[in-house]
């Protein structure tokens, strides 16, 4: 609630939990039901990314849903950034928190997000 209302007491400051949750909702209730090919592409991209050592010690490493949610947050410039110097061994995030950084770091995930959401200029307000 604090995150959605842009409260100063938001424990998720720097990221948008609505975008994150919406990403999972789209996957489970739209892509899985109507566009299984895209959902399968997420699974393949996740497996390749993890095999390549991407997303180490982040939420995106946990499973393909977390991977998708973290990617969508970054696609909408709505993810928290933890630089390598700031990150602990089990950090939730890394330095990827914008659309451009996602395109460079994980082009496969960026391409899937772009195919689902298009090149929209929309970004969350807080």
Where is each model-derived feature located?
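Short, conserved helix/loop micro-motifs enriched in His/Cys and acidic residues
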Residues: 1-5, 45-54, 89-93
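Arginine residue identity/basic-tract feature
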Residues: 11, 20, 27-28, 44, ...
């Amino acid at each position: 609630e604090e995150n959605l209302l842009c409260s100063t007491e938001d424990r998720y400051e720097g990221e948008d939990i609505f975008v994150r949750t919406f990403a999972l909702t789209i996957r489970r209730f739209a892509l899985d039901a109507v566009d299984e090919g895209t959902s399968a592409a997420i699974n393949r991209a996740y497996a390749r990314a993890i095999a390549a050592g991407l997303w180490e010690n982040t939420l995106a490493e946990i499973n393909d849903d977390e991977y998708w949610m973290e990617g969508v947050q970054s696609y909408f410039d709505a993810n928290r950034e933890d630089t390598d110097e700031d990150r602990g061994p089990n950090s939730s995030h890394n330095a990827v928190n914008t659309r451009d950084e996602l395109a460079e770091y994980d082009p496969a995930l960026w391409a899937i997000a772009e195919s689902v959401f298009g090149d929209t200029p929309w970004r969350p307000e807080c």
